[in-house]
Amino acid sequence: MPIYIVLLGPPGVGKGTQAEVLAEKLQVPHISSGDIFRENIKNGTEMGKLAQTYMNKGELVPDDVTLSMIRERFSRPDCINGAILDGFPRTPAQAEAVDTMLKSFGGCVDLVPYITAPVDILMERLAGRWTCRKAGHIFHERFNPPRRQGICDFDGSELYQRDDDNPQTVMHRIEVYKDQTSPLIDYYKERGTLVEINGFMPIDQVSAQLISALKK
């Protein structure tokens, strides 16, 4: 049976890092909704072009367009044993749509780790975050520094700091996330799949909590 995980947590909590740990442990891909958007837009797919028209107008991309792209990604051979979904769903309605989609693949959402940390820690983490230009790998000047300053350990590309990682924008992103995600947390709690993970710990200890949750 495939295993499907939805990873939740506010900006800066370390979802991307932990998703990679889980992906390696389970031998399934880490699928970020942001990466799916970028891939479809870059490749000029029908859904990518449609999404771009909404984005150009400053409008939200409709759920059916996003789900179509996610469905296509989940249908690829590397997802035969499952996948880790990050960045989507964000609302109960989207979660229901994901549930319906996964049923068509013979699976369901097996686990929803919700990684949390105090706001001041999230602010500190984001302010020191650097991102790989080529593949989006994330490093931190204090918590997870690259071996060579300014260079990605994985592909040797340049690391850069995103514009939205400044303090004011970060605080707004955290507040928006909490407001948007609260109903989603309740949705997964009711289904018994939500597991709260303490993200205010070293990376390996957070990973250990996730692995332990998988075994239950």
Locations of regions flagged by a protein language model:
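Glycine-rich phosphate-binding loop of ATP-dependent small-molecule kinases
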Residues: 1-216
